[in-house]
Amino acid sequence: MKRTALFALMMTLLLTGCAPERDKNEFLRWQKELAGGTGARFSAAVAADCGGETVLYAGEVVCSGGETSVTLTAPETVAGISWRSADGGETLSFESVTLELAPGKTAEVSPCRAGPLFFAALREGQYLYGGRDGETRTAVLALGEFTVTAVFDAEMSPLRGEIRKDEKTLLTVEIDHWESW
C-alpha cells in the first residue's frame, strides 16, 4: 500500500514538474515557426497610457519582410492614418500626405508601435516564463527594454498582450483575426 501511494505521489510530482518545461518548449517551437515565416496580419485594439490618460485606438497591422504598416481604424478622428516602418525609417501619412510624427499628446511608446512591437516580441523575444490557465496559455517575453506578456488560445493564436517598461504598463493590445504566413 505504501509503495502504491509513494508511486502515485512520485508520478504526480514528475508530471507537474514537467509542465513548465513543456509549455516553454511548445512556445519556442511556435516562435521558431513564426520566425521562419515571412509575416503576419491582425487587427489590434490598443489602450495607451498618454500621460495618465488612457487613449483607445484600433488598427490593422501587417508585418511582412522588413516592412511593418499600421492603418488606424478608430477612433473616427484618426481613422485612415497610416504608420509605416521600413529600412530603419518611419512615416505617418493620411491619404498619401506625410504627417508630423509626434503631434498632440505623446505616449512613452506610440500606440502605432503596439502591434509591431507585440509581433516582434512574439517572433524574437526571449522567453522568460509562461503557463496555462484552462484553455489559454501565457508567455512572458523580454524584447530590449520591454517586457511583453502574451496570451494565446489553445491553438496558439494570440488573443491579447501587455507591453511594459520598468514595471509600468504602457500599452495593452487585444488581437483579432490573427493570420501568419
What are the functions of these language-model segments?
Residues 11-62, 181:
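N-terminal leader/targeting segments and the immediate start of mature chains
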Residues 127-181:
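Gly/Pro-enriched, hydrophobic low-complexity segments
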Residues 35, 46-48, 93-146:
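Flexible, processing/modification-adjacent segments and terminal tails
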Residues 1-4:
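Positively charged n-region of N-terminal signal peptides that target proteins for export
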Residues 58-60, 80-84, 147-151:
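Short, surface-exposed charged micro-motifs
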Residues 62-119, 169-171:
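An acidic-aromatic
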